[in-house]
């Protein structure tokens, strides 16, 4: 395991590793432990009491963060005809024409999210091997396969995120930037946690929210007491 630098070690001393904090305390500590010059992303990792190997315990969904992500989200749309104009008017950065599709096949990924109208899924399917591993494959379950492309583009631009529990039972997502300050970050974190709770599988037994940890890109993790979500 690589050793952390002096600054990381110094900041870690501010945090009681055995303690479980409420939302406000956790975010304030996390921001106070930021020691780099750039505007770090704030992430949250939630370990759930589920077994993702079972389909009825898969936790997956989307949530619109009240204060967005604090970064520009570049959106690519697979559409044709009037839906192209609708997507561009809503703020889409790219329309996947034949030239763009060829660029993607050659390894171009200058976008963060992809949306497709249902009638374009034949084209999208041919790119599954390159889009899928990067989490860029449009999916009806996350609202990115739809004829309402304007709404989908606007939501992604505003900070809508999609998430899915990993094999280890952990969901890890960004919830904003250090520059947001504690108040806006708390609002984003609560919106995300409330959605996770709402998606609790009926087959999940025992403790559902096992651990919740927030951290900045380079900073140490701060644990939130799951009891504060009730």
From Swiss-Prot:
GO MF term set: rRNA binding; structural constituent of ribosome; tRNA binding
Database matches in SUPFAM superfamilies: Ribosomal protein L1
Pfam families xref list: Ribosomal_L1
InterPro entries (alphabetical): Ribosom_uL1_bac-type, Ribosomal_uL1, Ribosomal_uL1-like, Ribosomal_uL1/biogenesis, Ribosomal_uL1_3-a/b-sand, Ribosomal_uL1_CS
Cysteines joined through disulfide linkages: none
Gene3D superfamilies noted in UniProt: 3.30.190.20, 3.40.50.790
This protein's UniProt keywords: Repressor, Ribonucleoprotein, Ribosomal protein, RNA-binding, rRNA-binding, Translation regulation, tRNA-binding
One GO BP annotation of this record: regulation of translation
Record GO cellular component, one term: large ribosomal subunit
Domain of life: Bacteria
Subunit structure as annotated in this protein's UniProt entry: Part of the 50S ribosomal subunit.
Function: Binds directly to 23S rRNA. The L1 stalk is quite mobile in the ribosome, and is involved in E site tRNA release. Protein L1 is also a translational repressor protein, it controls the translation of the L11 operon by binding to its mRNA.
Family listed: Belongs to the universal ribosomal protein uL1 family.
Protein name (database record): Large ribosomal subunit protein uL1
The organism of origin for this protein: Desulforapulum autotrophicum (strain ATCC 43914 / DSM 3382 / VKM B-1955 / HRM2)
């Amino acid at each position: 395991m690589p050793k952390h630098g002096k600054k990381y070690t110094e900041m870690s001393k501010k945090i009681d590793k055995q303690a479980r904090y409420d939302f406000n305390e956790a975010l304030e500590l996390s921001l106070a432990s930021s020691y780099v010059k750039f505007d770090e992303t704030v992430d949250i990792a939630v370990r759930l009491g589920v077994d993702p190997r079972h389909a009825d315990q898969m936790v997956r969904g989307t949530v619109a963060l009240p204060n967005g992500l604090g970064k520009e989200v570049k959106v690519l749309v697979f559409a044709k005809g009037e839906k192209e104009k609708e997507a561009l008017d809503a703020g889409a950065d790219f329309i996947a024409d034949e030239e763009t599709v060829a660029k993607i096949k050659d390894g171009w990924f200058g976008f963060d999210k992809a949306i497709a109208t249902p009638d374009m899924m034949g084209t999208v399917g041919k790119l599954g091997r390159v889009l899928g591993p990067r989490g860029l494959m449009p999916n009806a379950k996350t609202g990115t396969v739809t004829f309402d492309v304007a709404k989908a583009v606007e939501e992604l631009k505003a900070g809508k995120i999609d998430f899915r529990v990993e094999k280890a039972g952990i969901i890890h997502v960004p919830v904003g930037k250090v520059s947001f300050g504690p108040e806006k970050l708390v609002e984003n974190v609560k919106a995300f946690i409330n959605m996770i709770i709402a998606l609790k599988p009926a087959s999940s037994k025992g403790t559902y929210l096992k651990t919740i940890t927030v951290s900045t890109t380079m900073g140490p993790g701060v644990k939130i007491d799951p009891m504060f979500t009730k």
